């Protein structure tokens, strides 16, 4: 709802919209031109377990038991994304799956910190020029670094079969004085995604490409269905056009779809049992011409207002993702955009039950 509630045909509540079409025109164009997924849910709660879910289809027992103490400020560390070996998935991540199957792979910023891979399987398999997470660097700059590396590999016919690219500035920095506004951060992130689509669509490997875009976690944002519901996108030569898919999908289902395309086995019981995005694909490829849409919002706009939400933002740590209480941060973003008079909505927790059909007795 925070991003796509204004999409025609989707299950959205526009009263919860924060970053609509005027801020995220490229993501809206992707959802409109390809597939609108309005029933996608992340499997994770926060970034600490979210990146492990996104790359490995589960977070282990240690990580699931320790992130709550870390996030509540009661001790412990982040742990995820390879930060602590004990928190890594037992059989590794999707890159390990690729390695075992002889599938080429490369990472741009994911599980990379300070110019170093955080898991051994990514040594010599990541772009050293691509900046890892940090809100001082724009996502459009990250796109340019990816573009340069991609073009050099394409010229040598060495583009890996599996790639992960991280654009993370839609985390935003709240309303800290002198820093980009939430709108500016999200618009920058959206433009990077649009530029990525534009460049890939013009490349000779478009028909062989399938791109899946997801958030590692939903940041406990307001949603009228469930706080785990999250924006997700898929585009590529074989992806359907102008299609709305209400099928319930998940992080693990998206991973399973990638595995099926690459001929990989599932990594865990979760991706093995998840629903792949079958309905999103067509039988034949279709060319696509796209020009990235420059958001109407000023990408350079800075926070200038001194108020309660600015004071709360100044107390937060944005040096590392999810270093703050997600509910507190969600409240800051809500009131910074909606104003003080509209109450912050209570996070929605839904239960999804599929009743088994009873067979008639003879």
Which residues fall in each region the model found?
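N-terminal pro-sequences and low-complexity stem/linker regions of secreted or lumenal proteins
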Residues: 1-362
């Amino acid at each position: 709802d925070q991003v796509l509630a204004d999409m025609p045909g989707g299950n959205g509540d526009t009263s919860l919209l924060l970053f609509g079409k005027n801020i995220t025109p490229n993501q809206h164009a992707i959802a409109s031109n390809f597939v609108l997924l309005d029933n996608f849910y992340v499997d994770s709660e926060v970034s600490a377990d979210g990146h492990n879910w996104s790359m490995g289809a589960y977070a282990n027992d240690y990580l699931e038991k320790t992130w709550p103490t870390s996030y509540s400020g009661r001790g412990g560390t982040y742990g995820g994304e390879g930060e602590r070996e004990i928190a890594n998935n037992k059989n590794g991540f999707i890159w390990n799956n690729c390695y075992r199957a002889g599938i080429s792979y490369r990472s741009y910023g994911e599980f990379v910190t300070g110019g170093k891979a955080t898991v051994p399987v990514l040594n010599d398999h990541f772009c050293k020029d691509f900046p890892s997470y940090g809100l001082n660097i724009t996502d459009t700059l990250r796109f340019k670094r990816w573009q340069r590396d991609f073009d050099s590999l394409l010229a040598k016919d060495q583009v890996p079969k599996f790639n992960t690219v991280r654009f993370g500035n839609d985390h935003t920095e709240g309303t800290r004085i002198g820093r980009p506004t939430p709108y500016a951060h999200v618009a920058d992130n959206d433009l990077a995604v649009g530029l990525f689509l534009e460049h890939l669509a013009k490349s000779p490997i478009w028909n062989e490409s399938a791109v899946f875009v997801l958030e590692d976690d939903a940041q406990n944002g307001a949603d009228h269905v469930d706080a785990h519901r999250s924006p997700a996108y898929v585009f590529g030569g074989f992806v359907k056009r102008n299609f709305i898919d209400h099928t319930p999908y998940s992080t693990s289902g998206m991973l399973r779809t990638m595995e099926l395309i690459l001929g990989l086995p599932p990594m865990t019981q979760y991706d093995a049992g998840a629903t792949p995005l079958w309905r999103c694909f067509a039988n034949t490829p279709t060319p696509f011409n796209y020009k990235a849409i420059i958001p109407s919002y000023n990408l350079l706009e800075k926070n200038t207002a001194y108020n309660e939400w600015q004071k709360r933002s100044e107390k937060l740590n944005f040096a590392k993702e999810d270093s703050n209480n997600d509910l507190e941060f969600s409240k800051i973003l809500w009131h910074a955009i909606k104003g003080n008079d509209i109450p912050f909505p209570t996070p929605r927790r839904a239960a999804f039950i599929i009743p088994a059909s009873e067979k008639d007795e003879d």
